[in-house]
Swiss-Prot record:
Belongs to the ABC transporter superfamily. Spermidine/putrescine importer (TC 3.A.1.11.1) family. Its EC number is 7.6.2.11. Pfam families: ABC_tran, TOBE_2. This is Spermidine/putrescine import ATP-binding protein PotA. PANTHER family: SPERMIDINE/PUTRESCINE IMPORT ATP-BINDING PROTEIN POTA, SPERMIDINE_PUTRESCINE IMPORT ATP-BINDING PROTEIN POTA. It catalyses: ATP + H2O + polyamine-[polyamine-binding protein]Side 1 = ADP + phosphate + polyamineSide 2 + [polyamine-binding protein]Side 1. Part of the ABC transporter complex PotABCD involved in spermidine/putrescine import. Responsible for energy coupling to the transport system. It is found in: Cell inner membrane. The complex is composed of two ATP-binding proteins (PotA), two transmembrane proteins (PotB and PotC) and a solute-binding protein (PotD). It comes from Aggregatibacter actinomycetemcomitans (Actinobacillus actinomycetemcomitans). Its main location: membrane. Residues 11-241 form the ABC transporter domain.
Length: 372
């Protein structure tokens, strides 16, 4: 069954607070998660993302607040009685049991009739394409196969929500990319809510319907992967999600409701923003490396671009990255271009004088956080 994200809430976290001793991890935290959603809780170490997951699973007790699952208050419901299952980073498979017995374990703990266990286990193994591995032991499987068994063991219980705690971090790069795709497909097939916890922004952007980015126990931004990447709400979000250039800008004048004339690192140009501004106000102009264009200049040419010299070039297969040091102040900008060996305009050299520009309207403009 193809999954379509519904707007009906499946989980509501209402003003939850959790402390360890005198250290408050999250305080008055609110979050609504919709039915059938693939939601990723993303953030650096210590931001509170794993604490939120453990509270959802019932592995930690709240100090205050409420957790609502499908309309029912489960704040005081023990972990084993919640319709929630967790796939841990370690997978936590029993090495002495066969794959079949590992997947069947939860059903036996719930005293499900034996006649019902076999078809449900085989169906779960079929979903993760490991039905033929039923009689093997976990040590006979690869890391990716163990990951899928851990997921099968969780979904066989027919949970309303599946929690995944950094469960791809132990895999190598190629297998991790494969499992990202497989998890997304499986979630759509099952039609249940996945809540994935990670510090890896690429995983979050690749897999999620929605990302909640945490910082010090608070939500820094909540939105779709595209919104988070292209429209960061603040400098922390912009820097956490991929590479970003942060240029200093000084307001010259407002030209219209959405256009401001500004001096950006020596380049006088239009920037697009509806932020209230006044003359000489400091702003920050954010641009992804792939949104910047290099223009070749001779040593005496003046341009409406930011002028600088190329100080480093890095070939990355599909792209070519150039670091440009600005003549005006010695700051540096990063430019990423799709590599085309037949394009003479890409043949820049170390030390070459260049100008950098961008497509007007592609920039993100924020108030200068250093001067607030």
């Amino acid at each position: 069954m193809e999954n379509t994200v519904q707007n009906k809430p499946i989980i509501e976290l209402r003003s939850i607070t959790k402390s360890y001793g005198s250290n408050t991890i999250i305080k008055d935290f609110n979050l609504t998660i919709n039915n059938g959603e693939f939601l990723t809780i993303l953030g650096p170490s210590g931001c509170g993302k794993t604490t939120v997951l453990r509270l959802l699973a019932g592995l930690e007790e709240l100090d205050s607040g409420n957790i609502i699952l499908d309309g029912e208050d489960i704040t005081n419901v023990p972990a084993e009685k919640r319709h929630v299952n967790t796939v841990f980073q370690s997978y936590a498979l029993f090495p002495h049991m066969t794959i079949f017995e590992n997947v069947a374990f939860g059903l036996r703990m719930q005293k499900v009739p034996e006649a019902e266990i076999k078809p449900r286990v085989l169906e779960a193994l079929r979903m993760v394409q490991l039905e033929e591995m039923a009689d093997r032991k976990p040590t006979q499987l690869s890391g990716g196969q163990q990951q899928r068994i851990a997921i099968a063991r969780a979904v066989v219980n027919k949970p309303k929500v599946l929690l995944l705690d950094e469960s791809l971090s132990a895999l190598d790069y190629k297998l991790r990319k494969q499992m990202q795709y497989e998890l997304k497909v499986l979630q759509r097939q099952l039609g249940i809510t996945f809540i994935f916890v990670t510090h890896d922004q690429e995983e979050a952007i690749t897999m999620s319907d929605r990302i909640v980015l945490l910082r010090k126990g608070k939500i820094a931004q909540d939105g779709s992967p595209r919104e988070i990447y292209e429209e960061p709400a603040n400098l922390f979000v912009a820097r956490f999600i991929g590479e970003i250039n942060v240029f200093d800008a000084t307001v010259i004048e407002r030209k219209s409701e959405n256009v401001v004339l500004a001096n950006v690192e020596g380049r006088v140009c239009d920037i697009y923003t509806d932020i209230p501004v006044k003359k000489d106000q400091q702003l920050q102009v954010l641009l992804r490396p792939e949104d910047i264009v290099i223009k070749e200049l001779d040593e005496h040419e003046h341009s409406k671009a930011i002028i600088g010299h190329i100080i480093d070039r890095t070939y990355k297969g599909m792209t070519l990255e150039s670091t440009v040091e600005f003549e005006q102040n010695g700051k540096r900008g990063l430019v990423s271009e799709f590599f085309n060996e037949d394009d003479p305009h890409m043949d820049h050299s170390i030390g070459q004088r260049v100008g950098i520009t961008w497509h007007e309207g592609w920039e993100v403009v924020l108030n200068d956080e250093d001067n607030q």
